[in-house]
Design a protein with these regions (language model features):
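Structural alpha/beta surface segment adjacent to cysteine/selenocysteine redox centers
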Residues: 78, 83-167, 227, 232
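Hydrophobic single-pass membrane-insertion segments
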Residues: 49-59
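Flexible, active-site-adjacent loop/turn segments at secondary-structure boundaries
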Residues: 65, 71, 120, 149, ...
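A short beta-strand-turn-helix
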Residues: 63-80, 106
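C-terminal cap of thioredoxin/glutaredoxin-like
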Residues: 2-47, 85, 98-104, 167-232
């Protein structure tokens, strides 16, 4: 596993995906005018409005059920659940993906393993928004096609790039753009992040087999853990 942070970095790990983005922003710009404008925009006679910055469409609040729904492959009734905490900006996640390790495991344990993806966008400042984009693609039933496109053309994670990937895999562009621009799935990404830190995950990819977090897992270690979970 790569992308593991040094002890010094881990001590200052951002508390959330939003904090990771904010850290980068604070280093580049003076936000005093933005704060004043936000305060003014939030004051409405007779009530409070939900603000979605810069004229972007407002996100629809997520249900608790949606927070717990993840992209997955394999039967929900499978005796083993294999969770990957990953990042669409992670070079090691990409290498695992392109080498077909996930698909090899699913083939080896045919019908006995359910693979689940969860977001842990820790690697780049653009990773949290890319994670939201993946969730928007999942809404249209094409998360894994979208993931394929991002990893094939790796490193392109601007908002325009994320929208271009949506077009490449045949998503409804207007629906995807509205979802991404509104921050519709920021809460879902935060939910996954919080779950990862609870384990505690500090690098990607990270793997969990039936609730057991495997530190610094290799493909062989994953296979052994799955076999043990199956009682072999």
């Amino acid at each position: 596993m790569s992308n593991k942070r040094s002890p010094k970095f881990q001590e200052s790990l951002p508390a959330s995906p939003a904090a990771a983005r904010s850290l980068q922003t604070r280093r580049r710009s003076n936000r005093s005018q933005w704060i004043l404008w936000l305060v003014a925009a939030a004051i409405v006679v007779g009530g409070v409005i939900i603000f979605s910055g810069s004229g972007q469409p407002a996100a629809v609040p997520l249900s608790a059920d949606r927070l717990s729904v993840d992209p997955s492959i394999g039967p929900a009734s499978a005796p083993v659940t294999l969770i990957e905490y990953g990042d669409l900006g992670c070079t090691t996640c990409r290498r695992w993906h392109l080498s077909g390790i996930r698909d090899q495991i699913l083939k080896q344990f045919d019908g006995q393993v359910r693979y689940v993806w969860r977001d842990f966008p820790i690697i780049t400042p653009q990773s949290p928004k890319a994670a939201e984009a993946g969730q928007c693609a999942f809404d249209q039933g094409k998360f894994f096609e979208y993931q394929d496109a991002v990893y094939r053309d790796f490193g392109k994670l601007s908002n325009d790039d994320l929208k271009n990937f949506a077009a490449q895999v045949g998503l409804d562009a207007a629906r995807f753009d509205q979802c991404l621009d509104s921050g519709q799935y920021a809460a879902k990404v935060q939910h996954d992040w919080d779950e990862a830190k609870r384990l505690p995950v500090q690098a990607t990819p990270a793997w969990v087999v039936n609730g057991q977090y495997l530190y610094n897992a290799s493909p062989d270690k994953l296979t052994v853990a799955i076999q043990q979970a199956l009682g072999r």
